[in-house]
Amino acid sequence: MNNIIDGKALANEILADLKLEIQELTSQTNASPKLAIVLVGDNPASIIYVRHKIKNAHKVGIYTLLINLSATIHTNDLISKINELNLDNEISGIIVQLPLPSSIDKNKILSAISPSKDIDGFHPLNVGYLHSGISQGFIPCTALGCLAAIKKYEPNLTGKNVVIIGRSNIVGKPLSALLLKENCSVTICHSKTHNLRSITSKADIVVAAIGSPLKLTAEYFNPESIVIDVGINRISSNKIIGDVDFENVQSKVQYITPVPGGIGPMTIAFLLKNTVKAFKDSLYTLDT
C-alpha cells in the first residue's frame, strides 16, 4: 500500500533547490550562509541531531560553526556567547540545541538570540509575528515541515478539520497558527483532553506530537485520515519509534508519515531553508 508520506524524499527535493539557490547567491555576492550551532552538554540524542544538521548543511553549501559548551555553564555565560554570535556578521543563523540542562533558563537563552538570526523561530518576537498573522520573521521548522508534508498530498486545506495532539511551542502552537491561516478548523488536544479517540476519529488530518510511544492505534483514525507523526521516542540506542502504531495504522488511513523518515528530515530541510532566508535578509540589510 503506497500511502506513506516519504519525508526523506520531500526533504531531498527542498535540499536540492537550496543547493542551487546557495550556489547562485554565492556567485553573486562572494559570500555564503553560515549556521552557528550551540550544543550544551553531551546529551547523546542531541549529539546525533546536531550531526544530522551539520551533514545536511554541508550538502547544500552552508558553512557550520559548532560550539560545544559544558553542561555546567551558567545562563549568563551562555547569553554572553550568544551575544558574540549575534554581533558576528558572518553568522547568518543561530540555534541552541534543545533540551538544555535544567540549571539553565531556557526562556532567557532563546530570547537572547537576535530575532534576525533566530532560525528556530523561538524568540518571542518571531512567535508574536506568527500568531499575529504577520508575514515576517521565522517560523519553527517542525511546524513548517508538517505543513509542507500535508500540502503535498492535500493542497487545498480550506475547511479541513485538523486535530493536533500536543501544545508545545515547537509543534502544536505554531502549526495551529499555520493551519488557521490555511482556513482549517483546528482543535488542539493534550494530556488533559477527555475522549481523545472520539475527537481524532472524526478529523480529516491528525498530527501526533505527544512523545508517547505507539500511543495512537487504528481506532483513533478513519479511512480518510491523513496522519502526521511527529513523535520521536528512542527505545534503544539505535531504534526510534513514533507516537502512532504505524504497523497497524498504515493500512487503515489515507496517508501517514513513518518514524524515522517522516517529519525529521523535513524539519532539518526547513531549518536550512530558514538559514538561507536569514542570509538573504542580512544581504538586504547591508545594502540599505
Curated annotation (Swiss-Prot):
Q: Which SUPFAM superfamilies match?
A: Aminoacid dehydrogenase-like, N-terminal domain, NAD(P)-binding Rossmann-fold domains
- Reaction catalysed by this chain? (6R)-5,10-methylene-5,6,7,8-tetrahydrofolate + NADP(+) = (6R)-5,10-methenyltetrahydrofolate + NADPH; (6R)-5,10-methenyltetrahydrofolate + H2O = (6R)-10-formyltetrahydrofolate + H(+)
Query: Which keywords fit this entry according to its UniProt record?
Result: Amino-acid biosynthesis, Histidine biosynthesis, Hydrolase, Methionine biosynthesis, Multifunctional enzyme, NADP, One-carbon metabolism, Oxidoreductase, Purine biosynthesis
Pfam families named in the record: THF_DHG_CYH, THF_DHG_CYH_C
Q: In which pathway does it act?
A: One-carbon metabolism; tetrahydrofolate interconversion
Recorded GO cellular component terms are:
cytosol
Instruction: Give the E.C. number(s).
Output: 1.5.1.5, 3.5.4.9
Q: Name one GO molecular function term.
A: methenyltetrahydrofolate cyclohydrolase activity
Return the InterPro entries for the record: Aminoacid_DH-like_N_sf, NAD(P)-bd_dom_sf, THF_DH/CycHdrlase, THF_DH/CycHdrlase_cat_dom, THF_DH/CycHdrlase_CS, THF_DH/CycHdrlase_NAD-bd_dom
**Listed PANTHER family:** C-1-TETRAHYDROFOLATE SYNTHASE, CYTOPLASMIC (PTHR48099:SF5), C-1-TETRAHYDROFOLATE SYNTHASE, CYTOPLASMIC-RELATED (PTHR48099)
Family membership, please give it.
Answer: Belongs to the tetrahydrofolate dehydrogenase/cyclohydrolase family.
Question: What exactly does this protein do?
Answer: Catalyzes the oxidation of 5,10-methylenetetrahydrofolate to 5,10-methenyltetrahydrofolate and then the hydrolysis of 5,10-methenyltetrahydrofolate to 10-formyltetrahydrofolate.
Q: What is this protein called?
A: Bifunctional protein FolD
Task: Read off the lineage from the record.
Answer: Bacteria, Pseudomonadati, Pseudomonadota, Alphaproteobacteria, Rickettsiales
**Gene behind this chain?**
folD
